[in-house]
Swiss-Prot record:
GO terms for biological process: tRNA modification. SMART domains: RHOD. It comes from Nostoc punctiforme (strain ATCC 29133 / PCC 73102). It is an enzyme of class 1 (oxidoreductase). It comes from the Bacteria. Belongs to the TrhO family. One of its GO terms (molecular function) is oxidoreductase activity, acting on paired donors, with incorporation or reduction of molecular oxygen. This is tRNA uridine(34) hydroxylase. Keywords: Oxidoreductase, tRNA processing. Catalyzes oxygen-dependent 5-hydroxyuridine (ho5U) modification at position 34 in tRNAs. It catalyses: uridine(34) in tRNA + AH2 + O2 = 5-hydroxyuridine(34) in tRNA + A + H2O. The active site is at residue 180.
Length: 305
């Protein structure tokens, strides 16, 4: 994509001690807004995590601003492209964790698993002695995952430690390979598993996004699409925009095939939320959808005038 409308989408994170993280919020927000960058950045004592979008010059400027702090000088990011702005505004939030596991004693800056490059990943997960685990939430796994990977069926990352405790055994699962969207969840997951006594814990460096960017489709062991937390909903090989969209009612990712279901009604319900909708909830949702359509129509009229 090289058109003037192309947006650079930059996903970034780094675990690093930032005791002054609260003081960084306002200057960072002001700088991002001045560059016209939109998205969300989380700041916590344990580091930084976020996804932002903007022009090439704007993204480069924000990265320069972040890296001007010596603690973030080696901040890495993953880049993809879109013609449609994926965010509506810029937010910088202060959090207790940049990815919520709920175990503050787990510190990836002190102990973390072994990084595996996208080019080496296929060989690792094809090893019959390796247990491959998708650390993402169930709704993410359902639209795409690696061949042979286990799905912990978690509703949030906070549930991952319980999954490990009740389903895995350090004496039986001697080699474990973890993966997630961009790598951040695996940092904490691998740190936690090492603390639980697992001897060999590997994780995909750069996450699924880096794998889809660097590994040719014909060599890939990835099946489906990768859920992303912005307006694109999902991406495929080469980080091309995928085919999913979010149900307006429940926010679950739905495919074109899902829309064939008799339980799907645009703006009202999908197969994943239909059975939970009472008549009262359905009426509220219909009103919400009508209000949304009016907002969209008014916005288009303003753009034309």
């Amino acid at each position: 994509m090289n058109s003037e409308n192309t947006q650079i989408v930059a996903a970034l994170y780094k675990f690093v001690k930032l005791p002054d993280f609260a003081q960084k919020r306002d200057p960072l927000l002001s700088y991002c807004q001045a560059q016209g960058v939109k998205g969300t950045i989380l700041l916590a004592q344990e580091g930084i995590n976020g996804t932002i979008a903007g022009s090439r010059q704007a993204i480069d400027s924000v990265l320069w601003f972040l890296r001007s702090d010596p603690r973030l000088a080696d901040l890495e990011y993953k880049e993809s492209y879109t013609e449609t702005p994926p965010f509506e505004r810029m937010k910088v939030r202060l959090k207790s964790e940049i990815v919520t596991l709920g175990l503050p004693e787990i510190d990836p800056t002190e102990k973390v698993g072994t990084y595996v490059s996208p080019q080496e990943w296929n060989d690792l997960i094809c090893d019959p002695e390796v247990t491959v685990i998708d650390t993402r939430n169930d709704y993410e796994v359902n639209i795409g995952t690696f061949q042979g990977a286990e799905n912990p069926q978690t509703g949030s990352f906070r549930e991952f430690p319980d999954y490990v405790v009740h389903n895995l055994d350090p004496t039986k699962h001697k080699k474990v390979a973890l993966f997630c969207t961009g790598g951040i969840r695996c940092e904490k997951a691998s740190s936690f598993m090492l603390a639980q006594g697992f001897a060999e814990v590997y994780h995909l460096k750069g996450g699924i996004l880096k794998y889809l960017e660097e590994v040719p489709a014909q060599e890939s062991l990835w099946q489906g699409e990768c859920f992303v937390f912005d307006e694109r909903v999902a991406v495929s090989h080469g980080l091309e925009e995928g085919s999913y969209e979010l149900c307006f009612c429940c926010g679950y990712p739905i495919s074109e095939e899902d829309k064939i279901s008799p339980k799907y009604e645009q703006g009202i319900s999908c197969a994943y939320c239909f059975d939970s909708l009472t008549e009262e909830k359905r009426a509220r949702q219909q009103e919400k959808w009508r209000h949304y359509q009016t907002q969209v129509a008014n916005s288009k009229n303003r753009d034309v005038s």
